Amino acid sequence: MKKLIVSFAIITTLIIGCKTNTKSNDAKTLTVALEPKSNSKVGGTATFTEKNGKVTFTAKMTGLEPGVHAIHIHEKADCSAADGSSAGGHWNPTFKKHGKWGVGEYHKGDIGNFTADAKGNGSITLTTDEWCIGCDDETKNILNKGLIVHQGTDDFTTQPTGNAGGRAACAGIIK
């Protein structure tokens, strides 16, 4: 009888453990490394996590000039050019004007600005239901796009780029 109870307890624990583990794997997570461009020393990582129909984006950068910088998703996951130009323009699958995220018209790649501290470290986080990781909706799918950290600030007005300056770092958003 003890063997039966012990066996039942072990099987129950395994079933509950597997079920819990499956639920924690519902999130899709992708982390990419930012590489320096345009003779900068900028590096860092960006993580995209999709859960419950929303993507949370977090980027952490180092080597920046202190001050405000723009960050955008660009058309291509190609960082081969020394100045990052191979990533193309801002990702704009809905053909909107450049602007500020969540205000009027804006590109799906118009993430916005963040501030680098006196040591050159900066971070930004955004959560949205306007992106997905690897879905069939090409107006939302961020895979195979580029992530660009700019040397300057996005003014949210100048078309089509926000006058954000050169490209300080690039990452391909690829699996």
Name each model feature, range by range.
Residues 19-68, 73-175:
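N-terminal leader/targeting pre-sequences
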Residues 14-17:
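C-terminal motif of bacterial Sec signal peptides marking the signal peptidase cleavage site
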Residues 1-4, 19:
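Positively charged n-region of N-terminal signal peptides that target proteins for export
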Residues 5-12:
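Sec-dependent signal peptide hydrophobic core
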